[in-house]
Amino acid sequence: MCTFVFESLCAMISTLKVNKIERGYWFIQCLRYCFIYIIKKQHRQADLPRNFGMRSKALYIGRSVGKWIETFCLDSNYSTHVYSLWAKSFLIIQFENVDPFVDHF
């Protein structure tokens, strides 16, 4: 379900008539509202080892997001690698400040 939502949001963002910076901003907002759900779900399904630290979980999910980005690249002038780095960086920052197992919404 979350994959579908994320992909749909990415598709909508790619149609926005905004510059790269604004598009990047909306992309990051997409991640913000998807990553806690993803982490909770994968944690409950025991897809992640119990001894994974928060930073490791962020990188793990960042790689998953990177795969989605390869399919739904938001701007042909930006490489998918750039979006993947944004995703990983954002997730790492979030994990250092937020407990992903607490619903913050």
UniProtKB/Swiss-Prot annotation:
Protein localization: Cytoplasm; Nucleus
Record has Cytoplasm as a keyword: yes
GO-annotated cellular components: cytosol; nucleus
Keywords: Cytoplasm, Nucleus
UniProt superkingdom: Eukaryota
Main localisation: cytoplasm
Protein name, entry field: Uncharacterized protein C16G5.19
Organism: Schizosaccharomyces pombe (strain 972 / ATCC 24843)
Lineage, uppermost ranks: Eukaryota, Fungi, Dikarya, Ascomycota, Taphrinomycotina
